[in-house]
Amino acid sequence: MNLWVTGYRSYELGVFNSKDKKVEVIKYALQKKILEKLDEGLEWVITGAQMGIEQWTCEVVAEMKKEYPELKLAIMMPYSEFAGNWNEANQESFSIRCSLADFVGEVSKEKYKSPMQLKNYQNFMLDHTDQAMLIYDPEHEGKTKYDYEMIKKYSEQEDYSYDLVDMYQLQEFAEMYQEKDSF
């Protein structure tokens, strides 16, 4: 099974530092959800490279591969030179995440030209995955809204399921994480 993982950008969560406790909780949630999917036959985690959920997913999967070497990570970008306009620190972070992946690719070999490239990216991700997992809450909109709407519509027409980890579930994961740390 191939799983598309996406979600909030770091700034949408108010995270501006990788040492923020929210990042630890989100990584914990990602790990727990990916472990569930491994039991269902997960082989590939396919994600983008946006700062936030997607890059944290790369870190989590890279760490999990030590214990689950059969797990693979692919990073797909909607167009070439995806991180080209990012500052140096973010570009370095992007490069590090890409080095963790088993496969890195671009849906369009051209630089950004139009929103159609983003639509093509969504279609590519849907065509190359069996399920999606979103760290996203429709009550707290962000840029992931567009992926969520596309996935929801697609799942109504195709045999495609998705997990939505909303703010309530993130709070539950935060409590589990805190309990784990207190032992």
UniProtKB/Swiss-Prot annotation:
Instruction: Report the InterPro entries cross-referenced here.
Output: YspA
Family annotation (SUPFAM superfamilies): MCP/YpsA-like
One matching Pfam family: YpsA
Q: What family is this?
A: Belongs to the UPF0398 family.
Q: Which HAMAP family match?
A: UPF0398
Question: What name appears for this protein in its UniProt entry?
Answer: UPF0398 protein LSL_0930
